[in-house]
Amino acid sequence: DECFSPGTFCGFKPGLCCSARCFSLFCISLEF
């Protein structure tokens, strides 16, 4: 499935972020 890289605009589709979650409309990496 197609997904967005961290830092990419995700709108209201958090499930499309690759190994990241949608925060403030952008994919944020879960790694710290």
Curated annotation (Swiss-Prot):
Q: Does the keyword Ligase apply?
A: no
Q: How would you summarize where this protein is expressed among tissues?
A: Expressed by the venom duct.
Carrying 4-hydroxyproline, the residues are: 6, 14
Q: Name one GO molecular function term.
A: toxin activity
Subcellular localization(s) per the UniProt record: Secreted
Q: What role does it play?
A: Delta-conotoxins bind to site 6 of voltage-gated sodium channels (Nav) and inhibit the inactivation process. This toxin acts on Nav1.2/SCN2A, Nav1.3/SCN3A and Nav1.6/SCN8A (EC(50)=1.7 uM).
Question: Protein name, please?
Answer: Delta-conotoxin-like CnVID
Source species, please?
Conus consors (Singed cone)
